[in-house]
Amino acid sequence: MLKGATLIAGPTASGKSALALQMARERDGVIVNADSMQVYSVLHLLTARPGPEELAMAPHRLYGHVPPSKPYSTGRWISDVRELIEAEALARRAVIFVGGTGLYFRALTEGLSPMPEIPEAVRIRWRKRLAEEGGEALHRLLGEADPLAASRIRPSDSQRIVRALEVVEASGRPISYWQGQASHPLVDMTSCRKIVLMPDRNTLASRIEKRFDQMLRHGAVEEVKQLLALDLPPSMPAMKAIGVREISAVLAGEISLDEAGSRAIAATRQYAKRQITWFRHQLGPDWEHMPV
């Protein structure tokens, strides 16, 4: 178990990475990514991963280490964090977890039940069926295979529906069985500091707009070209990064770059709003809610 860690959560563009870097430089620390999109190798600009200058200032872990062709889950992230701890890659350093994926922080502080390995063929088959049949049809199938899971998952939540169906097929047991297994946190709750940044709405909106404009100027279009060249299914998580769909439409001649920017900025604002709502309701009073 990791002692004395710092956890920094917050919505996109709230200044999390800058705060983490400041702390790491002051305390000879190492920064560990807790953002589900910043794990992907091709998506550097669109996910606002730290650049070369930031990477040179402090050690960074679990950034850009996953090919976008590979699915990546909360369970995989926890496994990667556990490997870092067991390999003593974080030993004798101030460890700072930073990101906007609330489920990662929940798993880190509350534990995550073990899940079975899902064969790649099973993943491909269910993602193909999702693309062909749609989420509502698969939700009906889940109602037959795992009624309890179906009652807990909205018909519109296609990612969780597919995950539950994959688990049933791969293990022969419903996902609720695995979720009921014992789990343990990876950080010592008595010695860690937990911070969630809560930015002013107008300030955040301005930051989001400015940041996406910078992404476009620095090569986001070329980044999307590289991603599209991989010919990935639209259901892959990396393909759902904000900006990918919008810039893809530009490359297809469907909309202008200005229109793509407007749409991506609006989508980012909506995403930040959902993040803030989640943090307010899911992160308890033991978290420092820090205005920025």
From Swiss-Prot:
Catalytic activity of the protein: adenosine(37) in tRNA + dimethylallyl diphosphate = N(6)-dimethylallyladenosine(37) in tRNA + diphosphate
Binding site for ATP: 10-17
Record has Flavoprotein as a keyword: no
Chain positions recorded as substrate binding sites: 12-17
Domain of life: Bacteria
EC number: 2.5.1.75
Entry GO MF terms: ATP binding; tRNA dimethylallyltransferase activity
Alphabetic keyword roster: ATP-binding, Magnesium, Nucleotide-binding, Transferase, tRNA processing
Gene Ontology biological process terms, A to Z: tRNA modification
Transport in keyword set: no
Residue numbers marked as site, Interaction with substrate tRNA: 101, 123
Residue ranges, annotated region (Interaction with substrate tRNA): 35-38, 159-163
UniProt cross-references to Pfam families, sorted A to Z: IPPT (PF01715)
Cofactors: Mg(2+)
Xref: Gene3D superfamilies: 1.10.20.140, P-loop containing nucleotide triphosphate hydrolases
Assembly and binders: Monomer.
Purpose of the protein: Catalyzes the transfer of a dimethylallyl group onto the adenine at position 37 in tRNAs that read codons beginning with uridine, leading to the formation of N6-(dimethylallyl)adenosine (i(6)A).
PANTHER family: TRNA DIMETHYLALLYLTRANSFERASE
Family: Belongs to the IPP transferase family.
Protein name from the UniProt record: tRNA dimethylallyltransferase
Gene of this entry: miaA
